[in-house]
Amino acid sequence: MKILNGAELASFVKVRQLKQVRNLRQSKKIIPKLSVVYVDSGNKVIDTYINLKKAYANDILVEFSVYKENADTIIERLNTLSRDDNIHGIIVQLPLPGDLDTDQILSHINPNKDVDGLSGGNFTPATPMAINWLLSGYGIDLSGKNVAIVGRGKLVGAPLIRLWKESGYNVDVFEKGDGYDLHIEIPKYDVIVTATG
């Protein structure tokens, strides 16, 4: 079994993005701005994800802002950011608290500013695209291969399943509590993607 390392790809992408942002700043006088919106649910992992995004944005010279909202204010914040011509990208940090309708909230992001591609617009979400690029970089074609995806979350699993099934690939999905013993099932597959967090 070969484990693919995304670190080289991530480094390449980061260098490329830094060049693109420098070009925007120098030749077009555009300062890219990214806003992250979240609802505090007490989940400390959210803080970690936001801090990682902030560090990445700083590394590639993108201005970064964070908005802590609640159930009553998040939609208005998203509408405001979506209308603001000075904001170029918006991310809703997931997961949202269970009592909120995630799809309904995401639908308030202007699709042209939806960095994660989750608002129902025409963009393929970023992580599934990165997985495709990683496979391509290693020369792996999924045609005729048996593919397993473990997890069907909104950010990775579900959009990857949809993308690959639409491409005609043979994809089986495994999720916690579905009754399968992954130690028995997974070795049967040519390509395995874990999308479990």
Feature roles, as predicted:
Residues 39-55, 125-197:
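Glycine-rich phosphate/diphosphate-binding loop of Rossmann-like nucleotide-binding domains
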Residues 45-84:
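Active-site cofactor/substrate anionic-group-binding motifs, chiefly glycine-
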Residues 3, 82, 89-142, 182-183, ...:
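Anion-binding alpha/beta catalytic cores of soluble intermediary-metabolism enzymes, centered on
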